[in-house]
Amino acid sequence: MKNINLIETKSWKDLKNHFKEVKNIHLKDLFLSDFNRFKKFSIFFENEILIDFSKNRITEKTLILLLNLAKEMNVKSAIKLMFSGSKINQTENRSVLHIALRNRSNFPILLNNSDIMSEVNDVLKKMKNFSELVIDGTWKGYSGKSISDVVNIGIGGSDLGPYMVTEALRPYKNHLNIHYVSNIDGTHLSEILKKINPETTIFLIASKTFTTDETITNANSAKFWFLKHSKTKETLDKHFFALSANINNAVNFGINIKNIFQFWDWVGGRFSLWSSAGLSIVLSIGFNNFEKFLQGAHVMDNHFYHTEYDKNIPILLALISIWYTNFFNSETEAIFPYDQYMHRFSAYFQQSNMESNGKSIDKNGNKVCYQTGPIIWGEPGTNGQHAFFQLIHQGTKLIPSDFIVPTVSHNNLNDHHLKLISNFLAQTQVLAFGKSKNSFLKESTSFKKEEDEFNRILPFKICEGNKPTNSILLRKITPYTLGMLIALYEHKIFVQGHILNIFSFDQWGVEIGKEVAQSIYKNINEKTKNSKSYDSSTQGLIDFYNFFKNKQNYL
């Protein structure tokens, strides 16, 4: 497929001219001029999710021009290439087929002339059988006791994704306690080990390559701790499991080959929650619920593949994002889930988006001259309202935001959810329309009496509005709807990367830092210490590290 420089397309040039016409139009004027705006700029999907993108600084013409850009960049052809198993991850010469992991229709997906679905289904069956044994208490630890705790050791996609999903689906949780360890800081693992009993705990070592330093370091320490209690290596077979694409490395670590749940090199780490790397999810919510989770994602996959441009939700949201980053010069996008169970959702898509599209070199190897991936951040509502919404409302930054809320809560505590929904609706309304001087004048009952003081304070109270948002309403957070929602965001990221003409499925920037860390480790480790010198800052920090370390007994 030919790589296209988007700034050379006719659509991009048309958008630049159009932006001059609309950049100062206010959202309240767009709504006043079209009482059908909500109907035109919203999609109700599968009777489960409403996507309202009417509070964006776009007109019907804007949308037409953005869709023209998607067509000129051959987005639908790119989608077909991904779904067909073409090696679109060209810098690593790999296919990108996480959609196969949730292919509930079981249609053939060929890779090297072989249907990969039989392998996918075999692993799913193995996950099902094992999870049922653990959940019903049949699987015993080395002392004959049933399992009570599961520790997932991974990092990046092997941690963020499963952790986010198990938290989001906590209402579906069974009796097992699920723990996640990712940070190489020994504190993370140490605090988990204090809470668990080695006799009733299993460890899932989640690493695609089984070489990731943080994961293997934590896994070795967990194994050492476990063997101190169990005394013999034979007991590992009851307690240690690998979720990996590298079977040899897992076996060399000491994992019984029967305890390895495989995934493949065509599964990117940040999409691995759908694979065996999501075994902790299955153990938390049960395989039946995991199947519903996969089904929800599959429904969104079908929508993404088959639906035309103008009704295709991931394409529309991707285009709107590019509109802000490249024409309004917004640098960040926020995700605000108004659901406490979803408290890790923003962090997960921070990684998924920024690791995918945080690139500055295009597919031809040239430096880009436009903006690529935005900074993604967010917190659950209403906590965020009392932390950083002040800046969104009245600051100097334009921060397009996604607001996500379920209409039905899992916890009907008095009128809590009604108040949560009210805050959700209020924030998107005020961000869009603001509050003007005239509004304050109408509300003021003491204006005549305190006119001078009122006028003095008034400028500080005015909110200009015109801050763009998407509102995403789910009927309820369930395995099915969460699967849909995650797949929606995944496909949005894919479309952005394709239009921006960058490779979204590598992460070379992450790899370089890890290599340098290995070099520094050898220098500051007493056993391998060498005389290598670094830049003055790094060397100065090393010297002070050694100073503090040597003085620690006296501090």
Swiss-Prot record:
Keyword terms, alphabetized: Cytoplasm, Gluconeogenesis, Glycolysis, Isomerase
Keyword Cytoplasm assigned: yes
Disulfide topology: none
Source organism superkingdom: Bacteria
GO CC terms: cytosol
EC top class, as a word: isomerase
Pfam family, one: PGI
EC number: 5.3.1.9
Isomerase listed as a keyword: yes
Catalytic reaction equation(s): alpha-D-glucose 6-phosphate = beta-D-fructose 6-phosphate
PROSITE patterns the record matches: P_GLUCOSE_ISOMERASE_1, P_GLUCOSE_ISOMERASE_2, P_GLUCOSE_ISOMERASE_3
Signal peptide (residue range): none
Function: Catalyzes the reversible isomerization of glucose-6-phosphate to fructose-6-phosphate.
Family assignment from sequence similarity: Belongs to the GPI family.
Protein name per Swiss-Prot or TrEMBL: Glucose-6-phosphate isomerase
Lineage per the UniProt record: Bacteria, Pseudomonadati, Pseudomonadota, Gammaproteobacteria, Enterobacterales
